[in-house]
Amino acid sequence: MSDLFDEPDDATPLEPEERDGLLQSWVTTRADLNEAEQASIDKGAAWARRRRGRDMLSEDFVRLLHKRMFGEVWAWAGSYRRTGRNIGVGACRIPAEVAQLLDDVRYWVEHDTYDPDETAVRLHHRLVAIHPFPNGNGRHARMMADLLVQQLGRPPFAWGGADLTDIGEKRRRYINALQSADRHDMAPLLTFARSA
């Protein structure tokens, strides 16, 4: 049996119909999938950097960024999930929750509610908590946070300086920091975001 769809214990597995959305026939192992996704993410990041200065706090941009990041690998990239998960809001609530989050972030920016780092980290945390897509939510949310913090005049985050898709100490620190943010303690996630 292939390890293609084996997920870390703290990751959300794909549903069978979502697995069928794999576009790359050469992908047969988890290592292949990671390689294909990273190549697609790199292209999506380059596309996003070229769009600097444009409004990124729109639902269209949220979906388009995900499509640009994962569209060469998954047919459903850029489409909100339609299935339940062990994390995130109910699928029917995703559009409203994303719209509310973006409204909140625009308010925070306009009224200097938080400093730029905290504004971007709060965007990241809530986007992960909503979990709008079948897969790639953490990577997408980190990219959104990086783009926002840069738009607010700060350098992108280091996010622990590691590949957070692999099981390891840095991923555990990231998950623990997200769980602290779930309990309204943003300090560990802020620290992790700037750690190398």
Predicted regions and their residues:
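FIC/Doc superfamily catalytic core
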Residues: 1-196
